[in-house]
Design a protein with these regions (language model features):
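A short beta-strand-turn-helix
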Residues: 45-67
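Conserved segment of the thioredoxin-like fold in thiol-based oxidoreductases
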Residues: 91, 96-128
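Thiol/disulfide oxidoreductase modules built on the thioredoxin-like
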Residues: 114-119, 126-172
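Conserved redox-active cysteine motifs that mediate thiol-disulfide chemistry
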Residues: 71-88
Length: 172
């Protein structure tokens, strides 16, 4: 009789502990994405990819126009998939595309851009991922449409044909 009670008691204790932790994770806001829409763009200092000069967000986003901030990496397959759509958006006169190269090797990133072309007017280097975190990004690719220094749209994942048309409609 005692032998059967010990395993049953162990299972009950395990289930209680599991439910306690599960309930705690459900109530946690650690994994809740930040709502970045209609918020001001983050203020930051960053290195320019091509020149290694340091600049600030205030200098980059000085004009009251549309900016498309694209967080990308050469090792990111979806980034390669969305690249042709970014190249098409590059032709829009009222849009400036800013690239943030995320946790990448400079040589591989340059090869990526030489191979596919660069849609970016400026590329920023984010070696440790802190700039992406400031923007509220969790990975690559993520893209933010900015107007008047405010984030007006956040795109998680690669830009596709539907999103391309949506962006064009917004900026017209």
């Amino acid at each position: 009789m005692k032998i059967r009670i010990v395993p049953l008691f162990s299972i009950i204790i395990f289930l209680i502990i599991f439910l306690f932790f599960y309930k705690g994770l459900q109530n946690s806001n650690i994994y809740v994405p930040k709502n970045t829409i209609k918020k001001d763009i983050p203020s930051f200092k960053v290195e320019i990819f091509e020149t290694s000069e340091v600049t600030t967000s205030e200098v980059i986003f000085k004009d009251n126009k549309f900016y498309l901030v694209n967080i990308w990496s050469s090792w990111c397959i979806p980034c390669r998939d969305e690249h042709s759509f970014l190249m098409e958006l590059k032709t829009q006169k009222n849009l400036k595309i800013v690239g943030i190269n995320y946790k990448d090797n400079n040589k591989k990133a340059k090869t990526f851009l030489n191979e596919l072309g660069s849609p970016y007017e400026i590329i920023l280097t984010d070696k440790d991922g802190t700039i992406a975190i400031e923007w509220g990004a969790y990975g690559v690719p993520e893209t933010f449409l900015v107007f008047n220094k405010k984030i007006i749209k956040k795109i998680i994942g690669p830009i596709n044909q539907n999103l391309l048309l949506e962006i064009k409609k917004i900026i017209e």
